[in-house]
Amino acid sequence: MNSFSGSLEKAKTLTENNAPMVDPFGRAITYLRVSVTDRCDFRCTYCMSEHMTFLPKKDLLTLEELDRLCSVFITRGVRKLRLTGGEPLVRKNIMSLVRNLGRHVQSGTLDELTLTTNGSQLAKFAAELADCGVRRINVSLDTLDAQKFRQITRWGDIDRVMEGFDAAQAAGIKVKLNAVALKDFNDAEMPELMRFAHGRGMDLTVIETMPMGEIEEDRTDRYLPLSQLRADLERNFTLVDSDYQTGGPARYVTVKETGGRLGFITPMTHNFCESCNRVRLTCTGTLYMCLGQDDAADLRTALRASDSDAYLSAAIDEALLRKPKGHDFIIDRTHNRPAVSRHMSVTGG
């Protein structure tokens, strides 16, 4: 991991105009995903091992430091900010960070503050999230079958997630459902998941499993190309391509029979790198310029080097010079190893 090597005086000069962030390929960086914790109250089999070793709490940035970092990114042109984890809502006092970041939505400097959650804590926090300016959230749900849900999450309770859906929608928050497509697990269930989501006014986005982190099972056995899933769905549904966008990588279709939207995120079969507008920040202050590569920049050192944001802003600029054109994801069937060694819960899903 690289740390910023420039001088403080140089940093002050660089940041006077708060110039928008643009990578070497001309892509404007307007979307920041922030993993506020690597901890989670589920242990989804495709995401992490059951007996995970989590980061020591002393290594985490404080919530105040995360707020400062996010605010610098917003000053530099970020318009959408997503809190992730792990499970973001299990971090102690997380709502203080959400409330502080909400001031940017209120002032108009941030278009959207949102989060991705497993739904387990939504019933507790939905009303407060809405009060802080959160208008949309993504909830991860791979099956509607209670027994299979317990199997895939190991620790999860689907009834709590359903209560979370109710609470979020009652609070006026728009919910999008995310489902990881898993061969021979939930592929036959996708029509039911789609009808469930669309029946409640929610979009559904399906995601190809990504080769990140060591897990107990062989993820190649579960890999399902979404081109195959789409072909299966088109036997019974009319899928009409849509130009609808949310600022993320999903490509959407409208399902004629339900009237709802269905999104596809395809990092393996059809990558979305050419339009990448995002970077990812971890709870330790590490900036990943690409989800599918291990190159990273240490922003914690720059953050703590000075009370001025100049040094930090210059460190961000230096990191963005290394943002690659595309990721290195590949399902390695020969060596049975992940393309990226870190878990998604560390990077932020």
UniProtKB/Swiss-Prot annotation:
Gene expressing this chain: moaA
Domain Radical SAM core per the UniProt entry, residue ranges: 24-249
UniProt-annotated binding residues for [4Fe-4S] cluster 1: C40, C44, C47
Matches recorded under PROSITE patterns: MOAA_NIFB_PQQE (PS01305), RADICAL_SAM (PS51918)
Keywords of this entry: 4Fe-4S, GTP-binding, Iron, Iron-sulfur, Lyase, Metal-binding, Molybdenum cofactor biosynthesis, Nucleotide-binding, S-adenosyl-L-methionine
Residues where S-adenosyl-L-methionine binds: Y46, G86, S140, M210
Keyword presence, DNA-binding: no
Family recorded in the similarity comment: Belongs to the radical SAM superfamily. MoaA family.
Pfam families: Fer4_12, Mob_synth_C, Radical_SAM
Lineage: Bacteria, Pseudomonadati, Pseudomonadota, Alphaproteobacteria, Hyphomicrobiales
Species name: Agrobacterium fabrum (strain C58 / ATCC 33970)
Catalytic activity: GTP + AH2 + S-adenosyl-L-methionine = (8S)-3',8-cyclo-7,8-dihydroguanosine 5'-triphosphate + 5'-deoxyadenosine + L-methionine + A + H(+)
GO biological process: Mo-molybdopterin cofactor biosynthetic process
Enzyme class: lyase
Binding site for [4Fe-4S] cluster 2: C273, C276, C290
InterPro entries: Aldolase_TIM, Elp3/MiaA/NifB-like_rSAM, MoaA, MoaA_NifB_PqqE_Fe-S-bd_CS, MoaA_twitch, MoCo_biosynth_MoaA/MoaC, rSAM
PANTHER family, A to Z: MOLYBDENUM COFACTOR BIOSYNTHESIS PROTEIN 1 (PTHR22960:SF0), MOLYBDOPTERIN COFACTOR SYNTHESIS PROTEIN A (PTHR22960)
Sites where the protein binds GTP: R33, R82, T116, K176, R278, V279, R280
Cofactors required: [4Fe-4S] cluster
CDD domains, alphabetized: Radical_SAM (cd01335), Twitch_MoaA (cd21117)
EC number: 4.1.99.22
GO molecular function: 4 iron, 4 sulfur cluster binding; cyclic pyranopterin monophosphate synthase activity; GTP 3',8'-cyclase activity; GTP binding; metal ion binding; S-adenosyl-L-methionine binding
Protein name: GTP 3',8-cyclase
